[in-house]
Amino acid sequence: MLSSVLFPAMRTLLLLKYVFSLISLSAICCQTVSAIPVVSREGLPMTLSDKCAEALISDVACDPNVLDFKPGYYYSPEILQRACTDTCKSALDSYLDRVKSSCGTETIVGPFDLEVSALIVPGMRKDLFQKTCLQDNGRYCNNVAATAAVIADPGVSRFNYLSSVPPGTVPPDPCDIQHVCLYVDDQSMRNIWATIDYYSYWVLYIINAGCYNMHRLNGTELCISAPGQKFVPGDATDLPGATVTTPVPAPSDAASGSNRYCGRWYGVKKGDYCNLIVLKFGITMDNFIFLNPALNSNCTNLYAEESYCVLPVGDINTYSGKPGYVSTPTGSETTATGIRFEDLPDATENPYPRPPPGPPIAEGTRDDCNYYFDGAEFQYNVTNTYWNSNCQIPPPQVYRVDPESFESWNAGLGNISRPECSFKPGFRYCGRYYALSDDSDEPTPTTPITTSDDPTSTSATPTTPTTSSKPSPGAPTMTGQPSACNKWHTVTNGESCTVIPKTFGITLEQFLAWNPTVKSDCTENFWAGYAYCVGVKTLGPS
């Protein structure tokens, strides 16, 4: 019964398919190829010259399928016969020559936002054409490769079906089955549907990309899950030591600054990079940089032949600097002895005399300066002197600071080089925001130096601060450090050059200016055991 209905229907379908194939081939053979543009003007950058742009958007005498060629894709013999012509090959060669002569060294933005030559457009198109249209003894290699891929791994191919399976037979690789049931008008298809046994696995056609041939699968059963045994992930992980409770000793080549409270170290080899390491050890980039603070935010200063921490001890959120950190006291608890605060007698000593608060702070002046002065101290006649106004006298002569810093601390003065700039008597101004070293002199107001014999002008000789012997660095130093340096610091293992300036009350810019051999990100010439300048008596804070 099945064969009497099935095989006539199959012969009818195959005959129709053969007729339509002949019609399609005749249409392909008779169709002419028109010229097509390789790229559109809208896709080109505005920086290209008109001559180069015209060359890139010029037409080539190729089939439109040529523009759809992609590496690793397979195409039907009909498409290749239509697209792979000598005319198209010559057109692509001419297109390359036109772009080469018109564009010269002009560039466009290529893959990964890289700047590349404009020749990449015709070059890539010609390369894809040659690889896709490659032939051997009259056969397209693209078709041979497609057949080999199907045989090696059929997947959902037309060879993956059985006409029938004996009753009671269990497929070796069972899968979830979906019975296809579609309403069709063709009486013969309904007859086939009525006679097919439930266990039949007749699939004459595969599903195409748009599912437009589902009606041909009426009455069949399709596998809708991966065949075979379902994958069940195990409990074990291939990441060694996912959680450790005790730190391991740091190796001798441990990177400077890396956290020594570490559960695992990894020695970086040539060719390694940060993304590879974090994937290998299952750690996030943020945590990897947190455990190795010498690495910059982009992780571009990873050094080979050094070991880095790749696993925290316990929960990384309990580390100092993380939200879960709790400072735990060490040692045994002791019982407090002595008198309770509540039982202490009331104080009877008279408080020491406190100095008066002084004049009010001038408008725009900082309220947290280390040293203030009264505006009445600088009321001089600066005619025929080096200065345009009294505001220029305190910074270099008394407080040894640069004018820019002085202006920022006293924003209400504005530009201190203006002749109309002056201090208001009875108001305090910031003379120095920071404290100088212990051996520095206390600032003393100085009258300006006269430059003429005008008896009406006030003149005086500025006070010269006393000097003291400069301290010895106490360790090897770098070149370029100032001779006036009066404070040194010897770097120890694990120290960061971003922390040292904060320790000594200076800025990172000052530290780098006094130690010019140190790179701005402290990755070069910042060595343990070397002394670095952290204070200059005559140039700034220490």
Curated annotation (Swiss-Prot):
Entry annotated with the keyword Signal: yes
Main localization category: secreted
Cystines in this chain: none
Xref: InterPro entries: LysM1-like, LysM_dom, LysM_dom_sf
Tree of life domain: Eukaryota
Domain LysM: 264-310, 487-534
Extent of Low complexity compositional bias: 443-472
Name of one Pfam family that matches: LysM
Protein name as it appears in the record: LysM domain-containing protein ARB_00327
Residues carrying sugar: N218, N298, N381, N415
Residue segments, region Disordered: 439-484
UniProt-annotated location(s): Secreted
SUPFAM superfamilies, per database record: LysM domain
GO cellular component: extracellular region
Organism of provenance: Arthroderma benhamiae (strain ATCC MYA-4681 / CBS 112371) (Trichophyton mentagrophytes)
Parts of the chain that traverse the membrane: none
Stated role: Might have a role in sequestration of chitin oligosaccharides (breakdown products of fungal cell walls that are released during invasion and act as triggers of host immunity) to dampen host defense.
Keywords: Chitin-binding, Glycoprotein, Repeat, Secreted, Signal, Virulence
Residues making up the signal peptide according to the UniProt record: 1-35
A Gene Ontology molecular function term of the record: chitin binding
